[in-house]
Amino acid sequence: MDPIIQTIQLFQHTLHHDANVIKAAEAQLQQIKVTDGYSRILLKILASNEVDISIRQGVSIFLKNMIITKWRGAEDESPITQEDAEFIKENLIDLLVHSHHLVQNQIEAMIEIIANRDFPEKWTSLLPKSIQYINTQDVKLILAGLTSIQLGIKRFRYVTMGDKKKELLYTIVNEIFPLLLQILEFLSQHQTIESALMQKKVIKIFGYAIHFEIPDLLIQPEVFNKWLSQFVRIIQRPITPQENVKHADDCRKNQWWLLKRTTAKLLNLLFRKSATSVRSTDHSSVKALNKLFMPVYSVEVMKVFYEQLSTLEQLYKGVHYERYQQKLIEYFSFAIKYGVTYVAMKPWLSTLIQQVLFPIICFNDRDAELWECDPNEFLRSQFESSMTFATARIEVLNFIIDVVGKRGRANLDMIMGFCIQSLNKYNAATNASEKNPREKDGVLVIISVLSAYLKNISFYKSNLEQMLLLHVFPELSSPHGFLKARACSLFSEFYNIEFTDPVYFSNALKLILGLMSDNDLPVRVKAGTSICNLVRANQGVDELRPILPQLLDKIFSLLSEAESEDLVIAIESIIQRFKHEIAPYAVNLCKNLSEQFLRLLELEESDESGESGFASQECLGVYCTLLRALKDIPDVFNSLEQQIVPILQKLFTSDHMMYLDEALRILTFVTYYPKSISPLVWSLFPQIMNLFDECACDFASSYVNPLDNYISYGTEYFLSNQQYIEMVFNMYKKMVGDINQQPVDAGDCCKIMESLIQRAKGRIDYMIVPVLELACGRLLNTDKNNQKSKEFTVYLLEIIANCIYYNPLISTQYLESKNLVEPIFGLWFNRIKHFQRFYDKKISVLAFSSLLTLNPSPNFVKFGTSLILEKMLQFTKDMLSIEKELDKQEAEREQKIKDGTLKPEEEEFIDENDEEDYFDNHKFEFEFTEIPDNQDCQHDDEGEVFLDDIEKATEYFENGGDLGEDEGDNFDDQNDDDDQDSEEDLFEDEDTPDFETPIDEVDGFEFMINSIQNFFQINPTCIQQISEKQQEKIKKYVASAPARKEKLRLEKEKEEKLKQQQQKK
């Protein structure tokens, strides 16, 4: 059979209704696609207009996937042959000209993939053929030529300065950009859709060419001026009624609007590139662009954009492309930062804000349509819930925030003067027809985004109460739903101001509670989400306490209507605020939470927007907040587990990895607060361990706490199950035994193994040698691929320390039998300054002390007595200093409690992740940093550093650099100078764990004194090895031991009494 006909038939079968026929056809296609010349057959089918379009669509996707996986540079056992590759490259652009529009996107994707790997060196025909097509009078040929150049140049947009590939780009720019400029000038006379599309492609080519660095040709003043004239011409050209669409939503498909938006985006890019602070290391073209664009062009473009914004609404009657409008406004947000543009802007700044930008943020017809037809979408489109979306409204609010934050108090006063005038005008109107509720909504939005300034500047702060009473609280009863919703949000924004009469707050709170049953969903949701802040206030507690169960039920009811993460946060705030009263409602609350989470999870699996994903994540956070609130009531946990464990069982699967961190956090609380592990919670252990082995190695840090709890609070059950012990060891082996595993993750597994060794003292002798073998092997491995860090080195050495403390005889026998004593202890002593935490020092002291208890003493201990004692005494000194500092801090804390300046455990009221103090009344006075109008604002240092980092990283990789940690740190070298990083603080990025371990109950000081005395009784001659200074230090410590023992006893008694008092409470 003819291979073309056979292939067409196979693709017909892939569209069959019978799954077996489809499967057989797909299998056969997979077999024959490796045949030499098969890609030519597919290309011929695509070129034939006689073949059904559905077949050609399938073929285009199939060929594109072949090119992705089999083209030069891809890892495939049967790549496309050189002959086939040349045939494809020779005919692909021609195919773009003549193919059906339904397959053109796939053909363009093929051109881009090939160009990215071959152009220009190995696809030398792309540029000449494209230029040939562009020079014709055929629209299809010109479009194909421009498209091919666009896709070819696109590969250079992320090539950094100094890269040799840039030279290739400069050559291409010099050859084709004069032609492209001519085309742009020629197309200005043609008013067709094809003309708009071709101009857009030219603009995109220009954008790709200057993305990282502008070529020298384009920075020549005469050339640059010609290009900029064309850009401005495109922006200024009006779109006729015939060219425009009938509905604003269709603008995103209109080529004329897309052309304008693409050009505005390019001009923003030019402004950013030219305005960026010029550094001495910058390429000459960057400096040239700055000198060329900023003094004149930046202002001229801004004026053009201002004219566009001013007339956009009037000219197009609301039917315009919002993304284009957003790009116009974005330019002004940049212009604020620079003196030359801000000085030019300032004379008409108030007009820009009040007459041009303000209407954009007011409630409009589009909002009204969403309010009625899709209230959930209305909620998503609002500023409070859509910070990540690029809309004209968001851009205006960003501009207002920046013009105040970067250019000072005068602008705040100007904007607030406008707002106050508008509010007073609204209130003064006696006739409802004279009031404009939509404008008032816009004013309240501005006040909301400027709230941080208003709450921290005395003049405004002193008037906030009056503003709320006159202009906000009345709208809680407004006939306009959108104003009621806005009033809820604004009241919650100013929840913590001090009212002269508490009744004002109470009355407003009652109105908001009532609005949670309003007829309009957005009002109900905004009323519910405002509770998040209102429960934090000093006022209103008495009103909320009696209705807690009804309030929670109402918010859960709202959650079933709207997937709002803010509603979930409101529940979390209620739990935090009323944690002592929440226990009676805990089980029902947990049940509702579980139902909502499962509903949101189901929505997320079918929701491409990801909105429900945020809300479901917040639900898991509420579990944690609830469990923390109930930590002193362990009896309730058994009931809560019935609701929580089924949720965790669902989440501890490979399909729900995005929830794994939070799920393990919940498991941490469930295994920690009850101080015992129920059979139901134990059922999760094999599941989380199997998940780790399958795909969760990157989550090792999240595993540390729950596994430590399992081992610590379920020790007997854990040790009775050999399979569980093996699972923990295999986890340790998987991460420590593989030199390619990241040090951070492997270090976390060391912590888990430490927990097991300490809890199972005397019961897992058989594991000590394998554990030591893995730790020593990773420590001393000199392979350049061995992933290592200073912190990880400490963790591995602490594994060895734990093994020695567990059983010094087994450990030393292994080390001696493998000749590891010298390299391990040499490394240990050489890295002694890396043992910076109290725990690091204590476990080392316990390990060294354990060596001294052996009888007979190993030779290396006897010969190294002086060195071992030196390290022990140094660590002991450090530990005593830390203890002294902690005692001082505790004494200061107790004094503050005694003085009444600190309440016991008051810090527990606030969530550890809460960014704002619950009772922050904004008592500090905000002061602006005033910058002269003609000066640039201070540049973002982080952004500058980021640019530097890009350049350094690029240079590093170009020079063949390797990003391995601690590069060149040879563990075999015992004489390296450790002083060079002695001041380096390690473990800074780690949360200090509050593990309860058996060694907490061991006094390292007493253990050390006893072991030293024991050692010298066994080896009296060894005392001659130690210095007089060491002997004096030991005597001093021995003499102080009784007093220290009594001090610890009294502290223990005090601790027990405090614990008993807390239990009584």
Curated annotation (Swiss-Prot):
InterPro entries: ARM-like (IPR011989), ARM-type_fold (IPR016024), Importin-beta_N (IPR001494), XPO2_central (IPR013713). Belongs to the importin beta family. The keyword Protein transport applies. SUPFAM superfamilies: ARM repeat. The lineage of its organism: Eukaryota, Amoebozoa, Evosea, Eumycetozoa, Dictyostelia. One of its GO terms (molecular function) is small GTPase binding. Gene3D superfamilies: Leucine-rich Repeat Variant. Residues 958-996 are annotated as: Disordered. May function in nuclear protein import. The keyword Cytoplasm applies. One of its GO terms (biological process) is protein import into nucleus. Keywords: Cytoplasm, Nucleus, Protein transport, Transport. Residues 25-98 form the Importin N-terminal domain. Residues 963-996 have a biased composition (Acidic residues). It holds the Pfam family IBN_N. PROSITE patterns: IMPORTIN_B_NT. GO terms for cellular component: cytosol; nuclear envelope. PANTHER family: D-IMPORTIN 7_RANBP7, IMPORTIN-7, 8, 11. It is found in: Cytoplasm; Nucleus. It comes from the Eukaryota. This is Probable importin-7 homolog.
